[in-house]
Amino acid sequence: MREVVIASAARTAVGSFGGAFKSVSAVELGVTAAKEAIKRANITPDMIDESLLGGVLTAGLGQNIARQIALGAGIPVEKPAMTINIVCGSGLRSWRALRTRTGPRRR
């Protein structure tokens, strides 16, 4: 089995719907967070094999915002990306999808 790691994570600032970030698209916010996660991990974008994103309210942003964000963060076009949108559980489902692919954590 291939070893899989989560090297880093970052999130955007928290705001209210229609608030300070209303003119910034979710894709732009995601690119900022992805670039920061890559920077914190001290890796290069080409080292990332796959991107998963849990997102909500993605209508009007185009297809597969995970892919748009990955490309915006410099991850090569050859690397796959998947958006999961099931409202509040999106982040958890993203984690579950990753765990299903990699198997249970070993101690």
Swiss-Prot record:
Class in the EC hierarchy, top level: transferase
GO cellular component: cytoplasm
Active site: C88 (acyl-thioester intermediate)
Compartments where found: Cytoplasm
EC number(s) reported in the record: 2.3.1.9
Catalysis: reaction(s): 2 acetyl-CoA = acetoacetyl-CoA + CoA
This protein's UniProt keywords: Acyltransferase, Cytoplasm, Transferase
GO molecular function ontology, one term from the record: acetyl-CoA C-acetyltransferase activity
SUBUNIT field: Homotetramer.
Function of the protein: Catalyzes the condensation of two molecules of acetyl-CoA to produce acetoacetyl-CoA.
Family: Belongs to the thiolase-like superfamily. Thiolase family.
Protein name per UniProt: Acetyl-CoA acetyltransferase
Species per Swiss-Prot/TrEMBL record: Clostridioides difficile (Peptoclostridium difficile)
